[in-house]
Amino acid sequence: MVQLDSKLDEATTAFYEGRSGNIPLAWTITFVILAGMFLVFFLYHRFILPRPASDNATVHAEGENLFSEFFATFKSFFTKENIGPALAFLLLFRLGESQIVKLASPFMLDAREVGGLGLTTGDVGLIYGTIGILALTLGGILGGLVASKHGLKFWLWPMAFAMNLPNLVFVYLSYTTPQSMWLISASVAVEQFGYGFGFTAYMLYMIYFAAGNHKTAHYAICTGLMALGMMIPGMISGWIQEIVGYENFFIWVVICTIPGFIVLKFLKIDPTFGIKKSPLNPPKGE
């Protein structure tokens, strides 16, 4: 059975490729390997991660006290100083990226006649699953290294630009629809590297804002808000794309990065936060 794309409004062509092999077995082997890798990672972190003396439970509650402590933890989070700018940052900093991440793969898989790049699932797997992951990891490592030298506040704006400006590569890809795998892969690598570098600022700010009493619970709340900031815009991204098309959608995504820049002006961050402490190079103010 062949199903045509409802978005096609002119004649098109299609190519079919027959493949043999046990596809269910291939998927099974893939997930068994992944499960084994996660087990290795678990064992590594179980025995390698440090256990500082300060890492102890600070609250011991049972029964009714447990519920009162639960709500007290939320209350203490939402009454923190500068909670307004912090919430805005957590929800808006990735407003553009939260929409791109939902539509990047459909954009690459959709036919060229409907504005996509017409790639195969194998192509997309290579671009995002290999090249993109490597670029993302390298960007994150570099972000951590530079933040340890000058601190979060120093790198906040550069990291914001690094996360958001590379979204322009999707505007370019949607307007030119190149066929070169090298060009598409390089574009995705740039975008993912910038995202990894910029996301360092997001993670560091969550750690910074969660500091104090109930810091573990407060960090968990921050991660929940992080997920909310990705989920809600992502829910409507497909609807927006169907209305305006890929070209205008990616322009819209770039516009959506503006609120994330605006909120940076209202964040209050200790200039020494994030700087790696060393007897030879102590943070400023110590």
Each language-model region and where it sits:
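Helix-to-loop junctions at the C-terminal end of transmembrane segments
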Residues: 138-155, 241-242
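Intracellular juxtamembrane helix-capping segments at the cytosolic ends
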Residues: 104, 197-211
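Short amphipathic helix-loop junctions that connect adjacent transmembrane helices
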Residues: 93, 102-124
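Loop-to-transmembrane helix entry/capping segments in MFS-fold secondary transporters
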Residues: 121-122, 212-222
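Intracellular loop-helix junctions on the cytosolic face of multi-pass helical membrane proteins
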Residues: 1-99, 148, 262-286
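C-terminal ends and interior cores of transmembrane alpha-helices
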Residues: 161-179
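Hydrophobic core of transmembrane alpha-helices in multi-pass small-molecule transporters
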Residues: 92, 179-201
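Interfacial helix-cap and linker-helix signal at transmembrane-aqueous boundaries
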Residues: 1-9, 109, 146-147, 238-245
